[in-house]
Structure formats: structure tokens, C-alpha cells
């Protein structure tokens, strides 16, 4: 039967390794500790693929920021994958510590309900303002992403106008913001759309999924207030948040997409395509429908000529950008904090590769 991620269900493979990897599982207590030990019989050992010198890896989830950083300071831990942003300057100034950082593949963006005829959690009755391109543009232009980068993210973000990491797929023309920040321009677009005094709506945000996720939403709410949009922030733990997303119980929400796969198809098919009940568009929670865009995505799925496929995908992303179906914000710059003796390779999927870890 399918694995139930929402209840934390583990599969047989979670605890019983198949014996072909560089490490074997010695111990696992869910949400407590996992211990991996170097496997001398791994086939890559003979080919020199084991470049690190760590024989045993111990993973300890520690929810409290203070406890986690105290464990690093006392050498109880050698490396922390998610140090609090406010601690980064102090860690960088400490000769006993080291900070390695890089931009994630994941893009954070706003999703707007473009399916309902009447917007939920709003004072607008009988219509949905988010279906109007001018309203979506107004919201986009009201957001000062540079201020979010500086004040909320403490410099650890990379603003983007794209739904994908552009440097990894050679689409640099998508990187700049689609429209410049401008309060006056945003107000004009709202007035043109029939909302000269703005309107009310609500944004759903996780408070423990992305870096400073709740603070991002609060900052955006303050920015939208300047153009007349009264936006309430409804922040919650990610388990509750994703349940609301699954049930479409929202009108606007913060979301992130990315991972180890860098091919644009892994964004186009599940996120950009409309929901067809067959797997495409399963994560298109804004539920817009654009038949021309769907055709481009479907063409890209089967096109074998690489230059032609790249051109099709670029056209699809341009259409998303021009219609403001999503409102891209930034990519997180993820810092890893460690003892100075540790050497690692930072990965854009925010995953540590034990094979490359060295202790000097």
C-alpha cells in the first residue's frame, strides 16, 4: 500500500538497507537519532569514490535553536544544517567555527486562488479579484523583495523572477523581476481593476517549513497594506498548513518548490500544468487553467530534440511569468554551521553527502 507521509509512516526500506550503499544503518529511532556506519564492501570503495574519512555518521534532530547551537558550541555536534540566521555573523567571527552557504534549488513563491468564482476569506462577494491579471500584478508590484532580503532574510536570500533556478537551466532572461517594485503603480492597477480602496483577504503560511516563513508573510502583509489590501496572516505548523493546501482551504499561500532534480520538467508538469486528475498539475494549488500553457508542457514532456525542448520550456515559463500565475519571491541561501575541523561540499538540495565529509 502507498506510504502515508502525513502520519510519519515508515517503509520497510527505512530500517533495512539493501546493502549496496556506502553506509549501513546501525540504529534508528524516529525523530531521536539515526546512526550510519561505513560499509567496507561497497562497490564504490574499490573505485575510490569514498572521498571522505568519516566512518560513522550520527544524525540528531534537535528542534530548539538554542539547544542545537549549544550542542555545536560544546562539540557535542560537529555540524548543524539549519543554524538560526541571527547567529551567522557570530559564527563567522568565531575561529572555532566555519559557515558554508549556497543558494537552494528551491524557489519560494506566492500561490493565488484563480479557480473560485468568489474568493474565500475576503470581503469581496460574488467575484474573485485574484482572477484579474491587474490585481495579481498589483500584489506583485507592492512587494519590496529587496527589503525582505535585507530585513527578514538578513541577506540570506536571492530574489528571483523565475519559478526555477535559472543558472542551472540557462534561462537568465527569466531571472529579473517581471515588474519593478512600486506602490503607486500597484495602486493604479488596483483602481483599474475596480478596487480603488483595496479589499481584504487572508494568506496561509507555515511557521516551521521555510526559512523565516511566517516573518516573510507578515512583511508582505505590511507591504500590501500600503496599497489598500488588508491581508490577515494565518500561520500554522506545516502539518496543518499542507492539510489546508491539500483541501484547497485557502485563497493565497506561501509555497516552495525545488530539490535535487534540476530539469525544468519537474516544475512544469506537477506545478505549472493545470490539474488533470492523472498526475499533471497535482501541485497547482492556484488551480488556474491555461490550455495553451498545458500544450507547451505536454510538448516538452515528449520532445526528444534538446534545443527544441529547451525552447518549448522557455516559452512555457514566459507564459507563466507574463500572466503572473505565480508570484516568485526568492531562493533561500542556506548556511551550514560546523566546527572548523569539518570539511563538506554544500549542495543546492540542502542535503549533506557523507561520502564527501572530512574531519581534520
Q: What residues fall within each predicted segment?
A:
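Periplasmic-binding protein-like
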Residues: 87, 124-168, 212-216, 320-325
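Short, well-ordered beta-strand elements
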Residues: 21-24, 34-35, 54-61, 108, ...
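Short, solvent-exposed loop/beta-turn-alpha elements that line the ligand-binding surface or hinge
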Residues: 1-20, 44-54, 91-102, 107, ...
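Structural transition elements
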Residues: 22-24, 141, 158-192, 209-215
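Bilobed periplasmic-binding protein-like "clamshell/Venus-flytrap" ligand-binding domains
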Residues: 19, 150-153, 192-208, 252-257, ...
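Periplasmic binding protein-like
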Residues: 78, 96-99, 216, 222-276, ...
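Extracellular/periplasmic solute-recognition and catalytic clefts
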Residues: 26-37, 60-122
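Ligand-site clamp/hinge motif
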Residues: 11-14, 41-90, 133, 230-232
Amino acid at each position: 500500500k502507498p506510504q502515508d507521509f502525513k502520519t510519519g509512516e515508515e517503509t520497510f526500506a527505512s530500517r533495512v538497507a539493501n546493502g549496496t550503499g556506502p553506509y549501513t544503518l546501525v540504529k534508528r529511532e524516529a525523530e531521536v537519532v539515526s546512526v550510519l556506519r561505513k560499509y567496507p564492501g561497497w562497490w564504490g570503495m574499490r573505485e575510490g569514490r569514498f572521498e571522505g574519512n568519516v566512518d560513522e555518521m550520527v544524525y540528531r534532530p534537535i528542534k530548539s535553536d538554542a539547544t542545537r547551537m549549544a550542542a555545536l558550541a560544546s562539540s557535542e555536534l560537529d555540524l548543524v544544517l539549519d543554524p538560526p540566521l541571527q547567529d551567522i555573523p557570530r559564527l563567522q567571527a568565531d575561529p572555532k567555527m566555519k559557515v558554508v552557504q549556497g543558494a537552494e534549488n528551491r524557489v519560494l513563491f506566492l500561490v493565488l486562488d484563480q479557480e473560485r468564482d468568489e474568493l474565500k476569506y475576503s470581503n469581496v462577494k460574488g467575484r474573485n479579484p485574484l482572477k484579474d491579471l491587474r490585481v495579481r500584478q498589483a500584489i506583485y508590484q507592492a512587494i519590496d523583495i529587496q527589503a525582505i532580503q535585507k530585513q527578514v532574510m538578513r541577506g540570506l536570500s536571492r530574489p528571483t523572477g523565475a519559478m526555477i533556478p535559472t543558472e542551472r537551466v540557462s534561462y537568465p532572461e527569466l531571472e529579473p523581476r517581471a515588474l519593478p517594485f512600486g506602490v503607486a503603480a500597484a495602486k493604479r492597477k488596483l483602481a483599474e481593476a475596480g478596487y480603488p480602496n483595496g479589499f481584504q483577504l487572508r494568506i496561509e503560511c507555515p511557521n516551521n517549513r521555510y526559512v523565516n516563513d511566517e516573518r516573510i508573510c507578515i512583511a508582505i502583509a505590511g507591504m500590501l497594506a500600503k496599497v489598500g489590501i488588508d491581508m490577515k496572516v494565518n500561520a500554522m505548523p506545516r502539518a496543518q498548513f499542507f492539510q489546508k493546501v491539500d483541501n484547497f482551504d485557502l485563497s493565497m499561500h506561501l509555497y516552495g518548490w525545488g530539490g535535487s532534480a534540476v530539469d525544468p520538467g519537474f516544475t512544469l508538469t506537477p506545478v505549472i500544468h493545470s490539474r488533470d486528475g492523472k498526475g499533471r498539475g497535482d501541485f497547482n494549488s492556484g488551480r488556474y487553467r491555461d490550455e495553451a500553457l498545458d500544450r507547451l508542457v505536454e510538448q516538452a514532456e515528449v520532445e526528444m530534440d534538446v534545443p527544441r525542448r529547451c525552447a518549448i520550456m522557455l516559452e512555457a515559463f514566459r507564459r507563466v511569468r507574463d500572466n503572473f500565475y505565480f508570484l516568485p519571491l526568492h531562493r533561500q541561501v542556506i548556511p551550514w554551521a560546523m566546527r572548523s575541523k569539518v570539511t563538506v561540499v554544500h549542495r543546492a538540495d540542502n542535503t549533506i553527502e557523507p561520502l564527501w565529509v572530512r574531519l581534520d
